[in-house]
Amino acid sequence: MGKEQELLEAARTGHLPAVEKLLSGKRLSSGFGGGGGGSGSGGGSGGGGLGSSSHPLSSLLSMWRGPNVNCVDSTGYTPLHHAALNGHRDVVEVLLRNDALTNVADSKGCYPLHLAAWKGDAQIVRLLIQQGPSHTRVNEQNALEIRELKKYGPFDPYINAKNNDNETALHCAAQYGHTEVVKALLEELTDPTMRNNKFETPLDLAALYGRLEVVKLLLGAHPNLLSCSTRKHTPLHLAARNGHKAVVQVLLDAGMDSNYQTEMGSALHEAALFGKTDVVQILLAAGIDVNIKDNRGLTALDTVRDLPSQKSQQIAALIEDHMTGKRSVKEVDRTSTAQLPLLSNTDAIAPMSQGSMEKTVTELILHFDTHADEEGPYEALYNAVSCHSLDSTASGRSSDRDSMNKEAEATGTRAAGVRPRERPPPPAKPPPDEEEEERVDKKYFPLAASEGLAVRPRIQSSAPQEEEEHPYELLLTAETKKLGTTDGRTEDHRQSGSGRSQDSVEGQDGQVPEQFSGLLHGSSPVCEVGQDPFQLLTAPSQSHPESSQQDACHEASMQLEEPGVQGTEPPQPGVPDQSKRVGLPAGLTALASRTYLDALTHTVPLRPAGAEEEDQSGPRSRAPPTSKPKAELKLSRSLSKSDSDLLTCSPTEDATMGSRSESLSNCSIGKKRLEKSPSFASEWDEIEKIMSSIGEGIDFSQEQQKISGSRTLEQSVGEWLESIGLQQYESKLLLNGFDDVRFLGSNVMEEQDLREIGISDPQHRRKLLQAARSLPKVKALGYDGVSPTSVPSWLDSLGLQDYVHSFLSSGYSSIDTVKNLWELELVNVLKVHLLGHRKRIIASLADRPYEEPPQKPPRFSQLRCQDLISQTSSPLSQNDSCTGRSADLLLPSADTSRRRHDSLPDPGTASRADRFRVQEEPSETKLTLRPPSLAAPYAPVQSWQHQPEKLIFESCGYEANYLGSMLIKDLRGTESTQDACAKMRKSTEHMKKIPTIILSITYKGVKFIDASNKNVIAEHEIRNISCAAQDPEDLCTFAYITKDLQTSHHYCHVFSTVDVNLTYEIILTLGQAFEVAYQLALQAQKSRTMAASAASMIETKSSKPVPKPRVGMRKSALEPPDSDQEAPSHASVSWIVDPKPDSKRSLSTN
């Protein structure tokens, strides 16, 4: 395979000399063996000398014959695939001369012709069609045979193939506007009526993406294409939906029926719904029937009449005027561009019923989602990291791997098996179309018409599957060659398809509601909403004007541009129309009254300081008024004229900031500057009174918030996420323990948590956290003076009933013990592995009255570990049975000292116990391990890899491949491990995928953790592991033997890593775990012996000097010598061994 790999690489990189050299030997051997000729004309299959001759000499020649010209890599690419994709014409010619087959499909069913057409290389396309030894069937589709496709007729729906898109080369060329390739394919009598899996013809794709020249070519060659429409769509509908007015005009001039009706209605429905005013005018001028209804019984006018954007009202006026003939188009344009008066009174919204508006828009969204599978044929082209998304993804940015990965994460998809730094260049830029020059004002539409396609979206959950099925996905693995000058100037040929430019991303996140993002996929929506959906349409409460000002009048009052106009002045004629920003219908605007604007000057702003910058980059969803505590509300407010004078902020500065509010920092700076003069004391007192009165109003609104908040808490996490437009993260939150809306408050869910669970988009994280602030915080334990009566009732209040058994079995049976919990214990002792559940518990214990844990290392004698031989067969998750605790680190210092005091009840001996403890501490501050050379004489190293504390209080994790396990019938130490390694290596040679696990090693044992989902698979206690060794034949492979306590059988578990050094470190860490466990056992025995000695002393006369203990104990155990003498004793085992059998009982580790 070495030569074939070289050939594949040379073809991919365009190394012509290397290709010729590798194939030169093949031509010689082919001619000598009697195979096909050098030009490849002799073999019917183009195989040449590839085993076609039955001469015995051919088998001998195979040993030195050149590489197979049709060899394939893991993606199914032949050298011809690589050369065609990357535009290496000379290499293609050489491969064709050497009998390269042109009709070999890759793993996604693509021929080299598909790749060349997608790339837009007309010369290579002609080469593949005309010069190949086997004439490429130009009409060949990715998977289904032609006879199957033609069985039901070329224009009827047919069977969808699951592993391809059923696209011809003409589809690929038409979609990207490769005019020359389309010409070449049409010259070969390519059938342009074929449809892909989503029933789209090449003409549909060209109309969808605005490829004007391709549309003209296809219509000129096959005028009958205009009659090949389906109930799903027509070219006219697709072009109208995306505002390609030139394409619309060409289709109408060619005779396409403008009144053709699909499930979504007429082309006028499409253009009106997606705000394409120019297309609406063209269709009206062409005499389209405005009374056509869609499948919901709505006309185009009904669809846009109630949508609250100026663009929709403009289109509605166009249609109405066309029906009545009252005004001309120019008059409508002049009317639409006239500025509307400033909307200040939100009572004007009242005639617009929230229920009717919400119902209308929701029905549109639900209808699109219902037909998502049929209507979203190119969803994978926008979301998946595939061949079609290689074109810089409509951003104009450098198309490196980082930007692509970021783009894939934003859509929730990522291509599997993508090699780093390998990416083919995008196809050559198609000729600019007339439609691409059209731009829509982004003030009203976040996505320009040419930057966003209104392709019907799939539901989010289907995106990964679609990506997996896309036949061009693996093109990412095709090339390492970097883009040259195209990187800086490449524009996506589907720029209107992805709509992911930086500007449009900001606009989309900041202005378009998430419910519409799935509807449009980049097309400019008519319903322009500045923040959370339908929030702007809510009728204000008369008793609480603050809530209504949040979305309507607050921004309007903050945008006064005249320097001399203060908050108490009525709006001037020069003030820009703010109703456009809040997305209200033009007919609902009203003149602002002086009284209402007066009230604005005393309104607490519902947007914190710095929100202006935030609006430019992220979602503008703001918390409801009562989500802030009163004290916080006092820090951010709008200022009246007198207040702004007090703070010496000029009106010009206010206008340039675009807001009448002042941040806390600005207020505090002004206050410090003014407080130097006593004359301002009365003014500041007045300000405080104003702020206090504002707080009272907020208190009233909090009662109302409780009612609406209770409804929110009854939602599921999925419903809550859907309400904020981030339902794609439901699985991430649920799988990580954020599974209850009642416990998603700001003291539970933090930005670091969202980053850890895989939410990489900072704007989405910000929006989640903003929504979480409106949820109630988890109440601290005993916040109301009444603590739960039991641990089960406390866990039940947190919705964590599943952990009751774990808490009780681990010794946490009372609320007092729970108050001392730390996260370390939650993970290692109580096995609360879900992050959201741990954060929920910690938030409940936030205000517990205890001291901080000690910073110095704990005393290991307090571990009170049992002898290894006396351990039960309980799993590693069981806590130490002596105290229910694992270390002093987990105990408050007061509780630790109290426990020591209780163990020595005689006051007369307390001082002696203290003296012994003080003497003991210097030698116990650090556990001393024997070096590897003493612990295991065969070990060639002199030091361990980790500190002992790492294996006691934490764990050492290593990623490895698990090859399998084998029953050991005759235990022979390392010989058994070698036999098992050899057998497992052989059995896994043909496995396509070897499972990856994480070995988590502690002094207690080894855990198997699934690397994909972090679930614990199995646990092996350290006392049951008898031998661990590397495989001498493959040093990346290692194994260890365990004993099954139930059956008494021994099993050898075999693993492999990618690095020899890593394997050696794992073996050494296992050995250190043995040593740590052994030394802790010695420490435990020493502690028990000392306790027995102290007890015997208490039984004697407490007033007399301490006698020498009567047990066979060395004096150093009772009165430890200096630390320099104690350290060697830790390194040796003999210092604690005593001839008496009692002292030997717990030292066996076999």
Curated annotation (Swiss-Prot):
SUPFAM superfamilies: Ankyrin repeat (SSF48403), PH domain-like (SSF50729), SAM/Pointed domain (SSF47769)
Gene Ontology CC, one term: cytoplasm
Comp. bias regions, Basic and acidic residues: 398-409, 479-495, 629-644, 912-924, 1139-1150
Region (Disordered): 33-53, 391-583, 602-666, 872-927, 1096-1150
UniProt GO molecular function: ephrin receptor binding
UniProt-listed CDD domains: PTB_Anks, SAM_AIDA1AB-like_repeat1, SAM_AIDA1AB-like_repeat2
Modification type Phosphothreonine: residues: 335
ANK repeat placement: 75-104, 108-137, 165-194, 198-227, 231-260, 263-292
Protein keywords: Acetylation, ANK repeat, Cell projection, Cytoplasm, Phosphoprotein, Repeat
Composition-biased stretches (Gly residues): 33-51
Residue ranges that the Swiss-Prot or TrEMBL entry lists as coiled coil: none
Biased composition (Polar residues): 496-505, 538-551, 649-666, 872-884
Residue positions where N-acetylglycine is found in the record: 2
Subunit organization: Interacts (via SAM domain) with EPHA2 (via SAM domain). Interacts with EPHA8; EPHA8 kinase activity-independent but stimulated by EPHA8 ubiquitination. Interacts (via SAM domain) with EPHA6 (via SAM domain).
Protein's UniProt name: Ankyrin repeat and SAM domain-containing protein 1A
Naturally occurring in which organism (per UniProt): Mus musculus (Mouse)
